[in-house]
Amino acid sequence: MKTIVIKLSGSLFSMDSGPSGIKKIVKTLDGLARNGVKVVAVAGGGKLARDIQKTARTFHADEALLDQFGIDVSRIHAKLLTTVSNKACPDIPTTLDEVLRYSTSHPIVFSGGLSPGQSTNATAALIAERTKAKLFINTTDVDGVFTSDPRKNKNAKLMKVISTKELLSKVVDDKMSAGTYDLMDLLSIKIIERSKIHTIVIKCDSRQIKSAISESELPMRKLVRKSTGTRILPLS
């Protein structure tokens, strides 16, 4: 049975966007499960986690505790997803071993973060590695990997393909403190690279998830300019 691991952007859980986006994505995942696909979806902490971490910093909380706040929020988000799905395991895993155990008996497992010092991107990449996932989809609040931040530069171009080496060079100077992980952090990229995980970066949207899965079966030479998101090539 094929396994797909999906990192769900924390932006999905913004209270401003309402529940419709969550419902559409969970419906898509339930549909995959009905078609015999195992799904592990890792929820991000998003704005709520960042706001809590920002407040805790004013009280001089250390980075490990800030990470734990982020993990706790992401697990609440994961639990929220279980209330929408009729295919998911009702329990939220707290270790990688629990993720693996739950996925043997349930077609869908929703997870939050697992360990302090590790982004939910890295958590999802580790799960993809351990489950030998056929596909890892990393969803963000933009359409994929761009030449620069598209929220700050209107001339930024979407990159259809990028190697892990190129991606590493883009993030190597990022500050690795709690709540600052954005597209991907160093650990998630190195996991993708070492295990040659088939990875696509897309916007957190149900239609894009469907498109990315269908396009993932296409060889690179058949990809067209309008294909969904960015493919990451695990090249060192």
Where are these regions (language model features)?
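C-terminal catalytic "cap/lid" subdomain
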Residues: 1-236
